[in-house]
């Protein structure tokens, strides 16, 4: 799909369809649509009146125009109230509009919306490209029939996309090519993460995840180091390797590094993504119902690698390390037992109270490794606790840190990206419940406050570096199609990480 920004009057656009955004509390339709061709505007206004269309957020109306206007259809989409018009509200509304373009089988389309107040037309163009690319993404990798005609329309995202060219109507002068490029790159990184999360565990393993990381590095000029089991043993990564010993697949400790090519980095950041490619629970086995979704337990790794793919192309003057301790948590004669004691790479000992609290064990060694790199800040993302989903639901990630500046930066990047975070307290007294009689700590505490105790466990493996933990267990997957989000893996975290780094 090709995007272009065109400096023309919307009335001059010619193509299959024109997608037009209208405010709920904006000018009367006759005034708002005055820039359209007179014949087109007359037809559209008549249908608006007949249908009593009110442009509330994400409301849509399709009007057939035809004739000799050079335009087949006009698609109206409500943008809601002007005071709430921000990049994310625009993305959500245009995502719905893009689905309509797909449904009417448009091959060429124009898009005409009011510019955003912050960032102007360049920010508007970037948001439009993101929204349309993400809304129209469909994962057909595992279907025997790859086209909609072969499937007779049996699609999980409204049929096959015919759209090949999108013209974004702008009024002023700007670096719109750069904005289109940024929007495309952000969408591609998010789609990459979506597809990693959605793929089953017989396709995404520690081995294939390492192969994907290597490919990202080769394509984007990143350094790539894959530590094998023997390397991890030399580094004393007993917590990570304890989890990995239950699977027949080799552990792969992935370390990608992006470095600015032409200047010394202003900052150095480490991003850690939890990389459990399938979580059976180990000997503390999970119930069968819902276990098929445990393929998503590498959602943090997907976000980290998606961000690596994006930042490798945007090339900020920040050094970024992307770290994934990849393995799966399986049941076998080699798997760790409840009650086993593991020694992490910082020398601390852990009594394994529950083998299904394995992600924090792999993150422990990843955190120690990251801090030894001498970075200025560490961010970890993990589908870590069901407790976070109970507390915050499926749309909001948990944020835990003792560094308020890091919390502020993540929240700001999340708001700009349409990804929601809610800060939970690092209540130190809760760690009392994780103390062990036989080791330095247990890997679980009481049922209450499970997201907080998980973060307090991770804190034991960070000494001085500013660090923030993001529990993305809820928003990494969705069963709903809404705005620009489709059913399946969401790619949550990619765009927040990218904007967090770019804002340093």
Swiss-Prot record:
It catalyses: Release of an N-terminal amino acid, Xaa-|-Yaa-, in which Xaa is preferably Leu, but may be other amino acids including Pro although not Arg or Lys, and Yaa may be Pro. Amino acid amides and methyl esters are also readily hydrolyzed, but rates on arylamides are exceedingly low; Release of an N-terminal amino acid, preferentially leucine, but not glutamic or aspartic acids. Its main location: cytoplasm. GO terms for cellular component: cytoplasm. Mn(2+) 2 binds at residues 274, 279, 297, 358. Its cofactor is Mn(2+). It is found in: Cytoplasm. Mn(2+) 1 binds at residues 279, 356, 358. InterPro entries: Leucine_aapep/pepB (IPR011356), Macro_dom-like (IPR043472), Peptidase_M17_C (IPR000819), Peptidase_M17_leu_NH2_pept (IPR023042), Peptidase_M17_N (IPR008283). Presumably involved in the processing and regular turnover of intracellular proteins. Catalyzes the removal of unsubstituted N-terminal amino acids from various peptides. Belongs to the peptidase M17 family. PANTHER family: CYTOSOL AMINOPEPTIDASE, LEUCINE AMINOPEPTIDASE-RELATED. This is Probable cytosol aminopeptidase. The lineage of its organism: Bacteria, Bacillati, Cyanobacteriota, Cyanophyceae, Gloeobacterales.
């Amino acid at each position: 799909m090709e995007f272009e920004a065109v400096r023309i009057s919307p009335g001059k656009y010619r193509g299959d369809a024109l997608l037009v955004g209208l405010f709920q509390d904006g000018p009367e339709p006759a005034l708002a649509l005055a820039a359209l061709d007179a014949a087109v505007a007359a037809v559209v206004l008549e249908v608006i009146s007949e249908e009593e269309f009110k442009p509330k957020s994400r409301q849509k109306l399709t009007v057939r125009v035809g004739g000799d206007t050079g335009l087949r259809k006009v698609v109206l989409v409500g943008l809601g109230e002007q005071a709430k018009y921000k990049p994310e509200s625009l993305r959500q509304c245009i995502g719905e509009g893009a689905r309509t373009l797909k449904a009417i089988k448009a091959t060429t389309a124009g898009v005409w919306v009011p510019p955003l107040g912050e960032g102007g037309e360049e920010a508007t163009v970037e948001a439009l490209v993101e929204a349309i690319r993400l809304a129209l993404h469909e994962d057909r990798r595992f279907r025997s029939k790859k086209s909609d005609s072969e499937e007779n329309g049996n699609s999980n995202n409204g049929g096959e996309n015919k759209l090949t060219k999108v013209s974004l109507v702008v009024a002023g002068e700007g670096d719109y090519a750069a904005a289109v490029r940024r929007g495309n790159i952000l969408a591609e990184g998010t789609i990459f993460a979506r597809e990693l999360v959605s793929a089953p565990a017989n396709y995404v393993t520690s081995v294939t995840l390492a192969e994907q990381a290597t490919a990202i590095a080769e394509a984007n000029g990143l350094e790539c180091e894959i530590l094998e089991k023997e390397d991890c043993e030399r580094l004393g990564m007993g917590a990570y390797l304890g989890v990995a010993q239950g699977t027949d697949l080799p552990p792969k400790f992935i370390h990608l590094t992006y470095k600015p090519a032409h200047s010394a980095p202003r900052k150095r950041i480490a991003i850690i993504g939890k990389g459990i490619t399938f979580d059976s629970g180990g000997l503390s086995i999970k119930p069968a119902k819902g276990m098929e979704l445990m393929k998503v337990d590498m959602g943090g790794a997907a976000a980290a690698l998606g961000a690596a793919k994006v930042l490798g192309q945007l090339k900020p003057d920040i050094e970024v390390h992307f770290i994934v301790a990849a393995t799966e948590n399986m049941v076998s004669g080699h798997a760790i037992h409840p009650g086993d004691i593991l020694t992490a790479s910082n020398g601390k000992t852990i009594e394994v109270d529950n083998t299904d609290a394995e992600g924090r064990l792999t993150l422990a060694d990843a955190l120690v490794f990251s801090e030894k790199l001498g970075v200025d800040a560490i961010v970890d993302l993990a589908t870590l606790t069901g407790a976070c989903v109970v507390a915050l639901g499926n749309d909001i990630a948990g944020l835990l840190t003792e560094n308020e500046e890091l919390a502020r930066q993540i929240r700001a990047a999340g708001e700009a990206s349409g990804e929601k975070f809610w800060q939970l307290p690092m209540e130190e007294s809760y760690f009392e419940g994780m103390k062990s009689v036989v080791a330095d700590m247990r890997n679980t505490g009481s049922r209450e406050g499970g997201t907080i105790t998980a973060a307090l466990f991770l804190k034991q493996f960070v000494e001085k570096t500013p660090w923030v933990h993001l529990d993305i267990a809820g928003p990494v997957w969705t069963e709903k199609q809404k705005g620009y989000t489709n059913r399946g893996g969401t790619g949550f975290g990619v765009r927040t990480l990218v904007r967090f780094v770019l804002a340093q």
